[in-house]
Amino acid sequence: MLTYLVFILAIAAIYALLAQSLVLVWGQTGMVNLGLVGFFAIGAYASALLTRNAGLPAFSGPVIGLLAGAAVGLVITLSTLRLRDDYLAIVTLGFAEVVRIVASNEIWLTGGTDGISGIPSLFSRTGGLTFHLQFMALATGLCLVAGLVITRLVRSPWGRVLRAIRDDQVVASVAGKKVVRFKAQAFMIGAGIAGLAGALYGSYISYIAPDLFLPLITIYVFLAATAGGNTRAIGATAGAYLLVAWLEASRFLGEVVPGVSAVQVASLREITVGLALVLVLRFAPGGLFRERNEKAPQT
């Protein structure tokens, strides 16, 4: 039981990283990245291929995932940042599906639908509970570091420019701010964090396949960020932990509700997630941790 709880905490920390990746992109800049799971997959596959096939050390996996996600994020931003918000959302959603389809069909590289197994781990798997505790501590520590960095960026002059772009892009441009450059920087940082999460995920479970990177993951992460507050790292983190707690608790609905099959339980989980999103948007649109109003500078 303890091993299971530690495993859930480790997965929650990875989801928290994914939710944090939306803070700068969505919460601060106003860009809707529906291709989040694509960057998650890019980080996982890049890390797995270079540590398992190319023989790079396992500890380089998170760095590889971070750099791969950031690099692909930069390419996407340079291609799409001049699009309106709704078109950007559509393009990024399509990007995530392209990544999944390529991973499914390029068998020579990704193993196709069979995926990649035997991914080197950062810690010895023979340790049992110790292995899970070590990985949980690492994932939680990286989550805290990412949260602190994001918080510092949000409170910096750079973060204020992002909010100016979010509130009125034209005014920010007229004020002399290079909108495209700031958007590209925010998107690249967010994509890098998502890639880092993917590398950690692959290393932890030692196996990745296209079916693990469905669009549903993006929906879950957006729900987590919405519930906790998409403008603050602490809100995104809290939302991710609440989401994972509910997803795991709802697995046992079949034991609570009589006459419900396993298939029906899975359907009920998705219904409750959708209902939770509607309720959050209705009663707490700013999330549990709303954006703080900045005080005007005193003269």
Q: What residues fall within each predicted segment?
A:
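Transmembrane alpha-helices and adjacent helix-loop boundaries
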Residues: 2-299
